[in-house]
Amino acid sequence: MGLTQKYDNMRLGYLFAILAAVMFGSVSTLAKPLVSLVNPLLLSSMIYLISAATLTPLAHKQRFQSSKRNYLLILAISICGAVIAPSLYFVGLTHASASDAALITNGEVFFSILLAMMFFKERLGIAGYVAMTLVLAGMIIVTTDLNFSDFTLQQIHYQDMLLIISMLFWGIDNNLSRILAQKIHVAKIAQIKSAIGGAILFGIAVFGFGVPLDVELSEIPPILVLGIIGFAASLYFFLQSLKRINTVRTVLIFSMSSIFGLVAASIFLQEQISWYQILAAGIMIFGVYLMNRKESLINPV
């Protein structure tokens, strides 16, 4: 691969990561009104089945290389990223605000980078550590309101814990997807993952918990948007980015989804954004900018 081609490929990777962040950032705002009307498990299953159908035209010509390793990987990816993570996320969202949920998505950055450094021997240069520290500092600001004297573990409600744990499983999904993306087309991974996860969730919701299929006609359009834009398109672009740039870079850029989520919650749900949230957003944006400007200092081993 020539230098120019490699540079263009990396630029595409950054562009795809930004698109994924914008699209996924809209999820909490779109989903918040729905989780009070549609059972979270049923909603998750519908979204992922829609996502699978959306990705089918892009993936139907792509082959899935048959091997025990690939089957185990896609199963693990599906269970972590399309069953456990969305279930916990939407259940937690039923009692959390859309803006809080958007901010907690930065937890995916922590877990994805931590797992990448622990198991895939990725390393950060000086600028990388500074950038990651800025992103982490932004999350600390929005979760504590800079009120450390009164902050206790008791203030972390169960819905917030569910959201945080969901980020752990999406972090596992991110790193496993990166492995499989080296051999399988990203559209095929996203399609199979969504189909398996959606089918499992549908079975659990309808046959396991007896959730009735009573979705109103007016609820279908936002569910379609969630499945097509919030998950199918964002997942596809995210995996495309993983294939072109490493997990650390992709996830740090993807952390901007929380900022887009904050803005969307403020505009469409009239949720108030405080000064410390604005401060945190600025810090995280600068961290991501620094990561891009000092890209050569990121040294995956």
Please report, for each region that a protein language model flagged, where it lies by residue.
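Transmembrane alpha-helices of multi-pass small-molecule transport proteins
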Residues: 36-84, 111, 169-173, 190-209, ...
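Glycine-/small-residue-enriched transmembrane alpha-helix faces in small-molecule transporters
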Residues: 1-42, 47, 152-179, 301
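Cytoplasmic-side transmembrane-helix entry/capping segments in multi-pass membrane proteins
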Residues: 69-77, 124-136, 184-193, 246
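Hydrophobic transmembrane alpha-helices of multi-pass small-molecule transport proteins
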Residues: 55, 75, 115, 127-146, ...
